Amino acid sequence: MYTLARQLLFKLSPETSHDLSLDLIGAGGRLGLNGLLCKAPAQMPVKVMGLEFANPVGLAAGLDKNGAAIDGFAQLGFGFVEIGTVTPRPQPGNPKPRIFRLPQAEAIINRMGFNNLGVDNLLARVAASQYKGVLGINIGKNFDTPVERAVDDYLICLDKVYAHASYVTVNVSSPNTPGLRSLQFGESLKQLLAALSQRQQELTAIHGKRVPLAIKIAPDMSDEETVEVARALLETGMDAVIATNTTLSREGVEGLEHGAEAGGLSGAPVREKSTHTVKVLAAELAGRLPIIAVGGITEGKHAAEKIAAGASLVQLYSGFIYKGPALIRESVDAIAAMG
């Protein structure tokens, strides 16, 4: 059934297809229909960051930037849902076209640029949802906020989403916001993490609950740089790391239509790069901090590979677009079969 739907959706432009799919998933969620359209994965509860996940396969940020279809995605069988990236103020993102499909490579290139309706709109959508499972909210900075003031935007978002999120993801790795990736390195990273940790402690006292903080990193760092990030996360008391965002590399898509478009590459071509980053993190963290793996999962066995590399949870994005809801169950089954 999804194969037919995909054929129809892929006749539309990628962004129109994305928006229509989100509308349909959201409507199905409100009507309680999505669970009837696909077989739910087996229950496989896991505890990570002190949170109980229905299963270890989640929706990655970026598909539902404004929280428009939380219930719909949950009904498809995801063990957790991450929405965003959201910024303090609404912003339109980069000019269109800004999403490109590369079906021969099971890949997508996007240069969306954190287009979203702002954090207040997202929180209204969260309040309207019925979902009681684990909800991650991914936060970023506005395009026109200077990178040296980025911490202000992250703190504004953290203050607002804290009471409504199961965990909060700090996105410092999108390649589509100029200067953002510089926050992954050296003193810039340590200062940002220290400020977030301090605010997390203050908000814990105010709200009477500690909401975990995860940092989402890029796949394009050297092993040495990845190790430095891991050490900074431990030093500042972060709760998890998400590996990885999209890549600037074009390995695997050279010569393909749209292969030279600017933006972040996701899907099958980023798989090995992302899994390598997970392995480097796992070796350095040695179980002291959980890893959420995302990047290139297009079959169930790829999810199992991420867990074998050292991840505790996985997330889907491009693979979900190409394979549909069946990939959720396939991924849960593959992880369960690891024993």
Swiss-Prot record:
Keywords: Cell membrane, Flavoprotein, FMN, Membrane, Oxidoreductase, Pyrimidine biosynthesis. It is a peripheral membrane protein. It is found in: Cell membrane. It comes from the Bacteria. FMN binds at residues 61-65, 85, 138, 171, 216, 244, 267, 296, 317-318. The active site is at residue 174. InterPro entries: Aldolase_TIM, DHO_dehydrogenase, Dihydroorotate_DH_1_2, Dihydroorotate_DH_2, Dihydroorotate_DH_cat, Dihydroorotate_DH_CS. Substrate binds at residues 65, 110-114, 171, 176, 245-246. The keyword Ribonucleoprotein does not apply. Its EC number is 1.3.5.2. It holds the Pfam family DHO_dh. One of its GO terms (molecular function) is dihydroorotate dehydrogenase (quinone) activity. The keyword Membrane applies. It catalyses: (S)-dihydroorotate + a quinone = orotate + a quinol. One of its GO terms (cellular component) is cytoplasm. One of its GO terms (biological process) is 'de novo' UMP biosynthetic process. Belongs to the dihydroorotate dehydrogenase family. Type 2 subfamily. Catalyzes the conversion of dihydroorotate to orotate with quinone as electron acceptor. Monomer. NCBIfam families: PRK05286.1-1, PRK05286.1-2, PRK05286.1-4, PRK05286.2-5, pyrD_sub2. This is Dihydroorotate dehydrogenase (quinone).
